[in-house]
Amino acid sequence: MAGAWLRWGLLLWAGLLAWSAHGRVRRITYVVRPGPGLPAGALPLAGPPRTFNVALDARYSRSSTAASSRALAGPPAERTRRTSQPGGAALPGLRSPLPPEPARPGGPSRQLHSKAGAQTAVTRFAKHGRQVVRSQVQQDAQSAGGSRLQVQQKQQLQGINVCGGQCCHGWSKPPGSQRCTKPSCVPPCQNGGMCLRPQLCVCKPGSKGKACEITAAQDTMPPAFGGQNPGSSWAPLEQAAKHTSTKKADTLPRVSPVAQMTLTLKPKPSMGLSQQIHPQVAPLSSQNVMIRHGQTQEYLLKPKYFPAPKVVSAEQSTEGSFSLRYGQEQGTAPFQVSNHTGRIKVVFTPSICKVTCTKGNCQNSCQKGNTTTLISENGHAADTLTATNFRVVICHLPCMNGGQCSSRDKCQCPPNFTGKLCQIPVLGASMPKLYQHAQQQGKALGSHVIHSTHTLPLTMTSQQGVKVKFPPNIVNIHVKHPPEASVQIHQVSRIDSPGGQKVKEAQPGQSQVSYQGLPVQKTQTVHSTYSHQQLIPHVYPVAAKTQLGRCFQETIGSQCGKALPGLSKQEDCCGTVGTSWGFNKCQKCPKKQSYHGYTQMMECLQGYKRVNNTFCQDINECQLQGVCPNGECLNTMGSYRCSCKMGFGPDPTFSSCVPDPPVISEEKGPCYRLVSPGRHCMHPLSVHLTKQICCCSVGKAWGPHCEKCPLPGTAAFKEICPGGMGYTVSGVHRRRPIHQHIGKEAVYVKPKNTQPVAKSTHPPPLPAKEEPVEALTSSWEHGPRGAEPEVVTAPPEKEIPSLDQEKTRLEPGQPQLSPGVSTIHLHPQFPVVVEKTSPPVPVEVAPEASTSSASQVIAPTQVTEINECTVNPDICGAGHCINLPVRYTCICYEGYKFSEQLRKCVDIDECAQVRHLCSQGRCENTEGSFLCVCPAGFMASEEGTNCIDVDECLRPDMCRDGRCINTAGAFRCEYCDSGYRMSRRGYCEDIDECLKPSTCPEEQCVNTPGSYQCVPCTEGFRGWNGQCLDVDECLQPKVCTNGSCTNLEGSYMCSCHRGYSPTPDHRHCQDIDECQQGNLCMNGQCRNTDGSFRCTCGQGYQLSAAKDQCEDIDECEHHHLCSHGQCRNTEGSFQCVCNQGYRASVLGDHCEDINECLEDSSVCQGGDCINTAGSYDCTCPDGFQLNDNKGCQDINECAQPGLCGSHGECLNTQGSFHCVCEQGFSISADGRTCEDIDECVNNTVCDSHGFCDNTAGSFRCLCYQGFQAPQDGQGCVDVNECELLSGVCGEAFCENVEGSFLCVCADENQEYSPMTGQCRSRVTEDSGVDRQPREEKKECYYNLNDASLCDNVLAPNVTKQECCCTSGAGWGDNCEIFPCPVQGTAEFTEMCPRGKGLVPAGESSYDTGGENYKDADECLLFGEEICKNGYCLNTQPGYECYCKQGTYYDPVKLQCFDMDECQDPNSCIDGQCVNTEGSYNCFCTHPMVLDASEKRCVQPTESNEQIEETDVYQDLCWEHLSEEYVCSRPLVGKQTTYTECCCLYGEAWGMQCALCPMKDSDDYAQLCNIPVTGRRRPYGRDALVDFSEQYGPETDPYFIQDRFLNSFEELQAEECGILNGCENGRCVRVQEGYTCDCFDGYHLDMAKMTCVDVNECSELNNRMSLCKNAKCINTEGSYKCLCLPGYIPSDKPNYCTPLNSALNLDKESDLE
């Protein structure tokens, strides 16, 4: 997209924003009017929409003029009632600051015209100015009736726009309202215009004028300014109502504060539009307006002035101007373009806060203004238009690095940046005066101005309020205001759709910019580029703001490189130096674009991050680790800069330090534009280039060996192309200054050919010559033009320290620096001041620079420097601080001078020092500069030092068709040409001669500029009084026969009837031969008739309803055709399609049945065939099935799963099957399964030494102790322990007996001791000798049959009786175990005379044989080892181990193990049982479900979903009720009655959340038919603890109220009225009706009112074990115990004893 000139401007038509004396704030509406557009022929600007930055600058200033001082003492003027007068009228409540305007020579007939050429605006200014004078006179006349007016105000209107109790002039009340809110415009607004405020019409696009009476066709647009006329300039509009009288200057009243708002709209160029657009700046009014604010402070409003520059081309540049061209060679003609952006509205509210102190008491008070609106009109605008005290500038420059667009084409840069766009960093350079102009304009006399930024979307709405879909625009609103003031931005919206003009005579990427600034010697044309990257908004990926990741500085393809050390946030990385970011994997940082949605907010610029919706904060890049390697990082606004170490230099962007580059080779070679995937170089250029020029431009490879060029963005690319793509740096530019070291100093030596110059007395040209941003390096420029001027940083009289020797000779005329200061000469216009740390060195003054012939030597001194510049950075004010060995000095900015007394930079008052400055105007001194305020009709000179008259007559559009006479500050039109006359607006307008009927009585009159022409009328018209009237031919007879006639303008047309067509001239109708058309009378004959045709159809066809076709007759509509088939219609006939089993007859008109049994002998083989209508049936015998309806085949029953079971094999036979069972199984009675043979039915199978245990398909013999089963498993045989256990009797003789063995001693006087395993002498009981030491303590072992028996230690340090008389199986130390004697043997009786569980004690209630015994507390003695995973309870004698539900106690391993419930077939009937720890799960196969017992899988029936007969209304049941009585957790899967819900499941019922009674209340017992039981005892390990104080008695119930026991007599089942008559219980009558009293083992189901079985194994087994050493199995109404393996039932109920113990007891009983 080619660049373009853009002319844009807004006129701010505004009153004054002021605070009244009573503290109220008036509402003021500002309308931004457009200026003229471009002439016809200019094309609209294409491309994406532009973004505007809107800046509101509010400034409060104090008056310092003599006139304001005299105004304080003057008498108060009368209050004016006219608030609608722009430019001069004061607000209600404010005194008029303007004196009346004296009469001008020439009388009132003289017309004043604006500078911009907008005729309507000039008249309005003049009229308003006169109204102000008349208003003042009226006020003086009404002052006598002030008292009478005050009485009327009490009874009349109040509020806004009320003057003296009535609506102010220009305001009225809407119907039905008592507020003055309706403005009036006289004359009324035309062409759809809107009366915005009194006498101000807002016109629609295409119209303008005071009353919008001028349309676009009547408006004469001025030609575009540009390079065609160097002497022309775009002047501003003239201020209306010049008040130049000095008669009342001494009587001006006291003034109030005024807010000066400066609105700046800044369109940003888009990426696709390479252009530089420059607005123009026009002067403001020259008058000062003073308004009262309270009674203490006074402010003076000073309108700003900005020079209106000329626009010239490069060829037409003269002295005093120069041009800057982008991408275009010198000599190319400029191009022109205009812009149409539509109307823009800005809504804001100003406010000001102050502190009022009275007698030491201070209070804060804030006054807030009404909502203020600024609107642009008509969509066309000049660059800068002004109104009283307001200025609107449209700025198109994208100022970077914190710069602000001040006016026209100037960026106000911060001190450390310069250049056209503030894109060039600079260290220590003085700021040019014109760059400081905008900043210093914001500083009033002694006032302090602060900035605030608001970012808002630029919304777009049509006039009907419907949103227009355009890409989003974001507006940055910069508000410049004093600290006590603030501005709140509400809305920035575009009212109309944007438009523009296309670019002409330009190439893509080219644009030309011309400037006019201070005088320079010649025109300089340079090439410059700037990056748009900082202007594109960024939309970051959605990520957590606190998430950290790695930051990558290079991204090539999908590879990320140059990762910074440490972690950082995504917004800090992508907003500054990073190109990718991530932790585990990297992702590219998205580009800053925001055109995805209309209302989407744009992100902050590069280098900033968003704090909130309206504020962007600078990112401190120096906090990121790894930034500026080989250097020190210095943070700047929106960026950062690297100060490099010795041996390194900054890259072109000053963002990194690179090693000193080598000298670039000047060797030339071929440059290739393409490299194929196979590394073949293609498309060489016709000339040989250096590698730098090739790779930095269009080349992809270079040299005879096809060396690939480095990729852009890599370090290798930056080394060879430091200026970036498209830029090369010559070898002389790559050389760095010479480094010389003096101690810790690093001083840069100036080259020899650099010529020193004195300090320039005039400011440098603006803008300065710019180099590309990428090409800025620390280098020196050498060339045939000589060295560039050097900017010195200190006065010439200072001394320079030595660079290469101990003494330095000062040459006359050389620039000199202060001691301790040196200069890094990066560029002639960008010096950098660095501080030195070494002490001063001796300096020798040359003879030429000294009056004495002797050299003066300054001895070195050792001092401690205090760097005042670091301690107080603002010590110099408007200047740069330079630290010296003694104190400091200041290098002041232009417009300032150094004050030795104040030690700072003070402003130079140019107005006082320069005489005759600002002639024809008024000079106003500003901070660092001055301002010429020119009156209306004058403009600033090119130098900005004088006011010169604007010759409006030089404009070709002024006084067109007449004579223009220029006057001082104005112009007038006289002597109109022939055919023209003077209009009321003062212009010559054409006379329309055609308005007279007699001008052309028989011809058409055509008006021309200045004349007219009579033209004869064409055919079909006749002339009459200058107009051509149509002739109605339809009135003539015989016109349009066979049709109707329609008269047209100048002709007629025939509309023909059906069957006729018009002739080519549409003046006649002719017959149509329809038969020539091929689509008529198909299947028939066509005959044409007059205006129609006729069809004759053949057999089988009939005429259609439209009579134009022969249609087929559908015979199939008759239902009797084709029975047993389908009738298919054909052309002229039909056919029958018969069903399967039928066939068509010979004639084809019906279907006949096919006898398959006779015609097909292959059907029903092995069976009987029976013919049916349309088919046949086959009947097969048993054991056979039909195969594809062709024959009978055998059924393979063995294919059915589960047939013959898992212990049989199915054998298929013809028509049947047979089961062959395995050994140990026999076929069942139905012959379908194999059943197990119970061999244990024969009692003799295992003889008398064991018992039989049947197994699947076999059996086994479980032998008693001392017996074992043989290899064949038949019976039990004795075990010979003497052979099996070698040495079991030691020295004694082992004798085997049946089931056991005996140890016999050889000496008859000895007996075998099983405790010691030796034979000992027989002793009597009264011998007094202890059989064994009783007090010896060792370890007690259990389960000696375990392989790891050494680890089975019950307890250490116990006696043998404590071990063997309780639960121990062995006793000893270090796994040397002595087995405990078996219970029931003589050894056991000898050791434990009182049996198991009793051990000897000192004192005991058991006293037998003189020894005391006590109960052994096994739980205390052995701890957790005796009852693992369970609860141990000591008993007398013995102990009990209580296991958790679902587990059982193993007395051998002394541990609670999980019970496998799945071994019980009743645990999960017809389902799959899965055992779990302490329980089990029963899974059913779909669609089967668990029944209520959760032990059986059943088929779901509809009865489960139906409401049973005994149920009442069902609803939701809520399982939980919160403390706030909120129902939650509804019961899923079923609805319940109120009783069922409250008694079984939940806490509330129904959609109304009806609460259930408390479970311990009487209502709950009554509802659920249960007695009150109190608190239940807990289950588990604490079940046997005494809780008598906390709980009721064990037996339930413990209390029943009498009202629940009225009558519990038993009734018969038929009398009960309950379903099933209370089975398993008895029916009793209660007060509420009937209920069931269930038998033991059953409980009442309240839902079904039936007695259901109590599962004691699950409900009671958790309190204590119901079955000891057995498994609990629930039965109907009770339960049973099934002994575990190794246990047999005992005589105790629900108790199983070990098998060994039972056998021993049986032997003892047999012996007895």
From Swiss-Prot:
Protein name: Latent-transforming growth factor beta-binding protein 1
Signal peptide region: 1-23
Modified residues (Phosphoserine): 1405, 1588, 1607
Description of its domains: The 8-Cys3 region in the third TB domain mediates the interchain disulfide bond interaction with the Latency-associated peptide chain (LAP) regulatory chain of TGFB1.
Protein's gene: Ltbp1
Pfam family, one: EGF_CA
GO CC term (a single one): extracellular region
Subcellular location: Secreted; Secreted, Extracellular space, Extracellular matrix
Origin species: Mus musculus (Mouse)
GO biological process, one term: aorta development
Disulfide cross-links: 185-195, 189-201, 203-212, 395-405, 399-411, 413-422, 551-573, 560-586, 574-589, 622-633, 628-642, 644-657, 671-694, 681-706, 695-709, 696-721, 869-881, 876-890, 892-905, 911-923, 918-932, 934-947, 953-964, 959-973, 976-988, 994-1005, 1000-1014, 1017-1028, 1034-1045, 1040-1054, 1056-1069, 1075-1086, 1081-1095, 1097-1110, 1116-1127, 1122-1136, 1138-1151, 1157-1169, 1164-1178, 1180-1192, 1198-1210, 1204-1219, 1221-1234, 1240-1252, 1246-1261, 1263-1276, 1282-1294, 1289-1303, 1305-1319, 1340-1363, 1350-1375, 1364-1380, 1365-1392, 1419-1432, 1427-1441, 1443-1456, 1462-1473, 1468-1482, 1484-1497, 1517-1541, 1527-1553, 1542-1556, 1543-1568, 1616-1627, 1622-1636, 1638-1651, 1657-1672, 1667-1681, 1683-1696
